[in-house]
Amino acid sequence: MKATQTLIATTKELPKEAVLISHQYMLKAGLIKKLASGIYTWMPLGLKVLQKIQNIVRDEMNKAGASELLLPSILPSELLQETHRWDKFGPELLKLHDRHNRDFCYGPTHEEPIVDMARDTIKSYKQLPLNLYQIQTKFRDEIRPRFGVMRAREFIMKDAYSFHENSQCLRNTYNTMYATYCNILDKIGLAYRPVKADTGAIGGDNSHEFQVLANAGEDIICYSNGSDYAANIELATYAKPDLSKRVNSQNTIEKIHTPNIKTIEKLCKEMSFDIKKTIKTMVIKDAGGNFFALVIRGDHELNETKINKLDQIIAPYTLATKEEIFSIFNANPGSLGIYNCPISIIADYSAIAITDLVCGANEDDYHFTNVNWDRDVTNYQIADIRNVVTGDISPDGKGTLELTNGIEVGHIFELEDVYSKPMNANIIGQDGKSKPMLMGCYGFGVSRVMAAAIEQSHDENGIIWPESIAPYQVAILPINYNKSDKVKEVADKLCQDLLGDGIDVLLDDRGARPGVMFADADLIGYSHHVVIGDRLLEQGLIEYKNRKTQEKQEITIAELIKLLK
């Protein structure tokens, strides 16, 4: 391919909202062009990267025994009303109606149409298992689309759906898809971690996310440094302390004056307390109107997902207002505690492990010290309600937990009958009885993984692609291509030879100044740069540069071809 035959649209101008490196470099390199908020045109170079990712995904899905299909982008409201998601999805669902005033939406995900197709075509267990996938454009009307294609309104996704007679069959395909996603990310060449995850709005039971490791990642994932345990922070847990080893304190409770101290940080600073000896008491109100006092150690944070999953809580909960708190405690937030607490207490294991703790006195401007569980506070329940922190012992007892940032690029679920049951997608089982098919759901963000790759690997000059998805493996950069017959002859022949060897190559024949060519090559991220000029040709040499290592060599063309092979 010659550069003059495609559109290389590099630019130095950037919109203010481009804060992530991936967003900046995709715009500067001319991979995408903004059309509207959260909606982008895929330019030729960007589309090449996208297609390479799609090809890897498609190849691995086919190897795993999945079959490709294509569902409509526009979905009738009746389907989503069967699962009640027409209203539950909220404003992210882009709704429209046709000339006959029938309601439709732009598909944000495709569980309903795939189940509709399956219930009409799959009638017996003999047709199962079946795994179907598509690579398609989705649309979710994000309230604040940001970070370029990382959180766009329109995006490209591979979504697969599997159908089964029983749970063991579903688990087998789930495990196959888990391995397939690992193969995809290995083949692309990204550092990643599969982590246990919350099922969220999709529903179902078992669930894993596939997180590309990157500092700009919105998700926090935790993993053990001594085992294969890994989980999203929403679900991550820790080895519970042995509460039987708590020391029985002989110290008596003391009430201390703490004027104008409303935060743990200020309390510890002004009163010289160890923050690990303090607790925070936060009041919530569940969906049934019940109030609870949630208690965690002073240096810990509540975990919303864990709290909403508690049997005692009618989800979703909200934080109690200042007025509600005062009406219950006759004290303001910042002075609340567990001693003589008027509402039910749910305390985290780490808070329960503290002896002689410090807490609010349920009276403004006062705190208690030397408060002890069981001796002073007996009416409480224990639960895991906090985020894990670095240094927590892994729940399997092997190693300690570490935290890092990740970008979610894949998510797999065991849906069971969450969609098939309400949509009456039934089969005749081996026992001759009718029952709902069980389902798995497997999503992979094709356009998102492109941004994740940039976040994981770049430098001050531009993108450093994994070679498997670089827009071109090799860029031939001829100096004075349009003026030197020798340079043109060598560059043209090398281009044809590399193409003949199956190497994806771009010949930059634009006639741009060397500095512009070199800067564009670094910015766009071609994996291998080949500079051809009269001076080196006189010695039978060309200059080779590896984009990833920045290593430069003056070598012969024969040596170059051997190196690239």
From Swiss-Prot:
One of its GO terms (molecular function) is proline-tRNA ligase activity. One of its GO terms (biological process) is prolyl-tRNA aminoacylation. It is found in: Cytoplasm. InterPro entries: aa-tRNA-synt_IIb, aa-tRNA-synth_II, aa-tRNA-synth_II/BPL/LPL, Anticodon-bd, Anticodon-bd_dom_sf, Pro-tRNA-ligase_IIa, Pro-tRNA-synth_IIa_bac-type, Pro-tRNA-Synthase_IIa_type1. The keyword Protein biosynthesis applies. PROSITE patterns: AA_TRNA_LIGASE_II. It comes from the Bacteria. Keywords: Aminoacyl-tRNA synthetase, ATP-binding, Cytoplasm, Ligase, Nucleotide-binding, Protein biosynthesis. One of its GO terms (cellular component) is cytosol. The keyword Aminoacyl-tRNA synthetase applies. Its EC number is 6.1.1.15. It catalyses: tRNA(Pro) + L-proline + ATP = L-prolyl-tRNA(Pro) + AMP + diphosphate. Gene3D superfamilies: Anticodon-binding domain (3.40.50.800), Bira Bifunctional Protein, Domain 2 (3.30.930.10). SUPFAM superfamilies: Class II aaRS ABD-related (SSF52954), Class II aaRS and biotin synthetases (SSF55681), YbaK/ProRS associated domain (SSF55826). Its main location: cytoplasm. Belongs to the class-II aminoacyl-tRNA synthetase family. ProS type 1 subfamily. Catalyzes the attachment of proline to tRNA(Pro) in a two-step reaction: proline is first activated by ATP to form Pro-AMP and then transferred to the acceptor end of tRNA(Pro). As ProRS can inadvertently accommodate and process non-cognate amino acids such as alanine and cysteine, to avoid such errors it has two additional distinct editing activities against alanine. One activity is designated as 'pretransfer' editing and involves the tRNA(Pro)-independent hydrolysis of activated Ala-AMP. Homodimer. Consists of three domains: the N-terminal catalytic domain, the editing domain and the C-terminal anticodon-binding domain. This is Proline--tRNA ligase. The lineage of its organism: Bacteria, Pseudomonadati, Pseudomonadota, Gammaproteobacteria, Thiotrichales.
